Amino acid sequence: GSSDLSLTVGATDDLNTVNREDDTIAGYSSRGPRADNSDGNPLNELKPEISAPGSNIIQAEGCVTSGLCSNLLGDAADNGYTGGGSGTSYATPSVSGIMALMLEANPDLSPAEIKEIIKLTAERRGEATQPDVDPFWNRDFGWGMADAYEATKMSFLLKEQELTGAVDVFT
């Protein structure tokens, strides 16, 4: 999604560890910025905007008709009813899930507010690539790795405090 209004998601690779500090941007994930669309707003060119896990993701496999389900315990790679894959198409659903949590916490959020909250609450990664345009955006990770807890918490706090309007990404 390179559209101005879309939230573009990059994929990270956890290097098969539980330690998020060693996560890297996946080699197949697009880097930014996107090509200038001549709209006069350099912030629109800062894509991707967020990153999320997208490498070696375990997924459920449909096995009712294939007969491959064996309900084995142990390594998920060998049980016949799960599979795995990698790609930004694996990273994007987790960000969609975060958006759902945010809307559960605060149904009054606008699409623009959701996008800004996700960017604001992201776990920052890498040095700012274009600090003259934005002090946090990085060409690999966007504004950072999506943080479901912080994004949902901010959504709830905005609802609880009856705050509306734009989120200031500089504070």
Which sequence ranges carry the predicted segments?
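Short, flexible coil/turn micro-motifs enriched in small/turn-prone residues
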Residues: 5, 27, 49, 82, ...
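Secreted peptidase-domain scaffold signal
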Residues: 137, 145-171
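Hydrolase catalytic cores
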Residues: 53-136
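Catalytic-core segments of hydrolase enzymes
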Residues: 1-59, 119-122
